[in-house]
Regions:
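Non-heme Fe(II) oxygenase catalytic core, chiefly the N-lobe of the double-stranded beta-helix
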Residues: 121-164, 169-175
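Structural signature of FAD isoalloxazine-binding scaffolds in flavoprotein oxidoreductases
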Residues: 100-121, 139, 274-277
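Short acidic-glycine loop/turn motifs at beta-strand connectors
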Residues: 8-10, 18-24, 147-149, 203, ...
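N-terminal non-catalytic cap/leader segment that marks the start of a structured domain
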Residues: 1-106, 110
């Protein structure tokens, strides 16, 4: 099942179900579920509830997707996005070549940081350039995991049931800000730096866990990143297990699992994003 947040014709934002082919939506309010945000709804959208919703929408007219404006599935996350740094070996190599000081890659443990998101950018939306602060604007295509229930002290190998679903996230990064401050929070948290979506696909739509998925990004049609999530150094099971030790991960938590090689700073010479491109 696919979940979105959409702006209805009357201007109200409502979490909704997106059809498999992406052409229709059913606002949850039409189905008797009055949740202000998808984050609020997620803890209650259990497999049993979703099964009932699937039966219900088969007999209810939908809105054509053209009649609504899709937002990011979780426009304003309740907490910062949890991110993994340097989680693909090829990206580790390119990052260290760009700046060994800022991206030292000799580590045996996962690198975690957080990303402030005041308002996530919808699919096809605009990234703010912040030209007064940023001259080296970069992109990072990532698989993001959305938790469906609170996770605390979850054993390794038992994290699957905590995953609500997956979405796509662009961890936009100001490389000059990032390297100047010797840490990543500020350079990744500027307004408009988190395109995400268009939808969350529930975990039960994938045959394997963790899923092995192609992950690609393009800039103006040019393929830049082309990898597979099976190449992650620390997989989703490891990450949820480790982060939940002594720390409660709330339902609705978003975990961005790292980007593969092919980012702008890794090219020779580096090729960063510019306003209008």
């Amino acid at each position: 099942m696919r979940f979105v947040t959409c702006r209805l014709p009357d201007g109200v934002e409502d979490p909704a179900i997106l059809s498999q082919d992406g052409t229709q939506v059913w606002p949850l309010s039409w189905l008797g579920l009055s949740y202000e945000t998808l984050s609020d709804a997620i803890p209650f959208l259990t497999p049993q509830v979703r099964f009932g919703l699937q039966l219900a929408i088969s007999g209810i007219p939908a809105l054509p997707v053209e009649a609504v404006t899709l937002q990011s599935p979780i426009p304003s996350p309740a907490q910062d996005v949890v991110c993994l740094g340097i989680n693909y070996m090829a990206h580790s190599d390119e990052a260290e070549k760009y700046s060994a000081d800022a991206f030292a890659t000799k580590h045996q443990d996962a690198i975690y940081f957080s990303k402030r998101v005041s308002r996530a950018v919808p699919d096809g939306g605009f990234i703010e350039a912040h030209t007064d602060l940023v001259q080296k604007l970069d992109y990072e295509c990532e698989l993001a995991v959305v938790l469906g229930k609170d996770a605390k002290d979850v054993p390794a190998g038992q994290t699957k049931d905590y995953v609500f679903g997956y979405t796509i996230l662009n961890d936009v990064s100001a490389r000059d800000v990032q390297t100047a401050h010797k840490q990543w929070y500020f350079g990744k948290s500027l307004d408009g730096f988190t395109p995400m979506g268009p939808c969350i696909v529930t975990a039960d739509e994938f045959d394997t866990y963790p899923p092995a998925l192609p992950i690609r990004s393009r800039v103006n049609g040019e393929l830049r990143q082309d990898s597979n999530t099976k190449l992650q150094i620390f997989d989703i099971d490891h990450v949820i297990h480790e982060l939940s030790q002594g720390m409660t991960l709330k339902a609705g938590t978003i975990i961005a699992t790292g980007t593969p090689a092919g980012v702008g700073m890794g090219m020779d010479p580096p090729q960063f994003l510019h306003p209008g491109c």
